């Protein structure tokens, strides 16, 4: 049989309309007895299709309704197919291994142990030692007896750094703790070092050439010479170019009074050949003294002690060294 195109379109439109579609679904469900998977049925918009979706439930319900009058126990079994199983206990009674409370308690316990460990570490011996000096009392000063000081000084003369055995033996001898003996030796060494420094500085001051150089006493016979000639050799000579050396009043030659009166400063009066050469020509502005000649005796007539002689010897050596340094300058 051949259908026209208009007839087929009408059939399609009638089949695709919502009302005809539901009727066809109902008829198909009654004939075939299968479930209908339409959008309205799945979403629950059409309540009439519940019987189509669960045809077995309706049959069970009718069957149970028919047998409910005779056997109520079987009704409960059919309505509740799992009723013969023992009911589950409350979830709070079952021990769950993934309970949040158990994890929180366990974490709290671990954190508590960690805090205790940190606190125990913080209370280490270092912190205890830091708090201990606050409670420590000041040690009293040890008063040594004469016998103890005598024995300690004798031991210090033998050795400035005694070993522990020597200190223990000495402590037993003087009836003192070994720690006190050790501290005494430390203080005694410090005192000894200070004394050594003081002595060394004193010796340096005594050995200094400027302090050891003392000007010897002048003889009365050369008294007028103080006003005419300078005593220091490095000062310029007051002699003028026109004044002869022998025309100065109070001037004495090298053979008159300097041999016995003033032996230390012979360079103030030049030798005779030098004086004669100075007469015709003018002296330079800075005259160089002649070399020191050791032809005058060192001993003085009124020499009091050997210390004065030693001082004069040092002065003589100092002047000679100064002359040697001035000679290249000339």
Curated annotation (Swiss-Prot):
What Gene Ontology molecular-function terms does this entry list? DNA-binding transcription factor activity, RNA polymerase II-specific; RNA polymerase II cis-regulatory region sequence-specific DNA binding
A Pfam family annotated for this chain is Homeodomain
Where is the protein situated, by its record's location annotation?
Answer: Nucleus
* Membrane-crossing residue ranges in chain numbering: none
Q: Is Lipid biosynthesis given among the entry's keywords?
A: no
Location of motif Nuclear localization signal in this chain is 312-316
Q: Which UniProt keywords apply?
A: Developmental protein, DNA-binding, Homeobox, Nucleus, Transcription, Transcription regulation
Its biological purpose is as follows:
Plays a critical role in eye formation by regulating the initial specification of retinal cells and/or their subsequent proliferation.
Checking CDD domains in the record gives: homeodomain
Tissue specificity is: Expressed in the outer nuclear layer, in cone photoreceptor.
Q: Where is the composition biased (Basic and acidic residues)?
A: 90-104
Motif (Octapeptide motif) spans which residues? 37-44
SUPFAM superfamilies for the chain: Homeodomain-like
Q: Where is this region: Disordered?
A: 66-104, 118-142
Q: Which GO terms describe its biological process?
A: camera-type eye photoreceptor cell differentiation; neural retina development; positive regulation of transcription by RNA polymerase II; regulation of transcription by RNA polymerase II; retina layer formation
Highest taxon in the source lineage: Eukaryota
Q: What is this protein called?
A: Retinal homeobox protein Rx1
Under Gene3D superfamilies, the record lists: Homeodomain-like (1.10.10.60)
Name the protein family: Belongs to the paired homeobox family. Bicoid subfamily.
Q: Which GO terms describe its cellular component?
A: nucleus
Tell whether Transcription is among the UniProt keywords. yes
Motif OAR is found at: 306-319
DNA-binding interval(s):
137-196
Q: Coiled-coil stretches, from where to where?
A: none
Q: Which gene encodes it?
A: rx1
